From Swiss-Prot:
This protein's encoding gene: pth
NCBIfam families: arch_pth2, PRK04322.1
EC number: 3.1.1.29
Family: Belongs to the PTH2 family.
Protein name: Peptidyl-tRNA hydrolase
Compartments, record wording: Cytoplasm
Main localisation: cytoplasm
SUPFAM superfamilies: Peptidyl-tRNA hydrolase II (SSF102462)
Function: The natural substrate for this enzyme may be peptidyl-tRNAs which drop off the ribosome during protein synthesis.
Cell membrane in keyword set: no
Gene Ontology biological-process annotations: translation
Domain of life: Archaea
Entry's Gene Ontology molecular function annotations: peptidyl-tRNA hydrolase activity
Reaction it catalyzes: an N-acyl-L-alpha-aminoacyl-tRNA + H2O = an N-acyl-L-amino acid + a tRNA + H(+)
Organism phylogeny: Archaea, Methanobacteriati, Methanobacteriota, Thermococci, Thermococcales
Organism: Thermococcus kodakarensis (strain ATCC BAA-918 / JCM 12380 / KOD1)
Length: 118
């Protein structure tokens, strides 16, 4: 049973290719994990040794990402908001995903438990 997880929240309103989408999710997962390793080393270590559970869900738009980020940070969860470089499909600086955690599953679920899987 997993006790820790990371959730990556993608914007539903962006029309990204599968490849672009996968890269943005990966950027979020790695960036938030590195942040957690520095800020919450005990959470990172437990998550890493449990198998690094990750879940990808969807949010309606940018405003919802900002709201989720604020909620997560209020609970002390590490977050990473990913902005695209804009070299291929979307304008530079477009926020694509929000990664939350890794953190205790019950805390992460307070922020993301209502979101639908992608």
């Amino acid at each position: 049973m997993f006790k820790y997880k990371q959730v990556i929240v993608a914007r539903k309103d962006l029309k990204l290719s599968k490849g672009k989408f996968a890269v943005q999710v990966a950027h979020g997962a790695v960036t938030a994990a590195i942040k957690a390793q520095k800020e919450k080393p005990e959470w990172f270590k437990a998550w890493f040794h449990e198998g690094q559970k990750k879940v990808v869900v969807k949010a309606e738009n940018l405003e919802e990402l900002f709201k989720l980020k604020a909620e997560a940070e209020k609970l002390g969860l590490p977050t990473a908001l990913i902005k695209d470089a804009g070299l291929t499909e979307i304008p530079p600086g477009t926020v694509t995903v929000l990664a939350i955690g890794p953190g205790p599953e019950e805390v992460v679920d307070k922020v993301t438990g209502h979101l639908k899987l992608l």
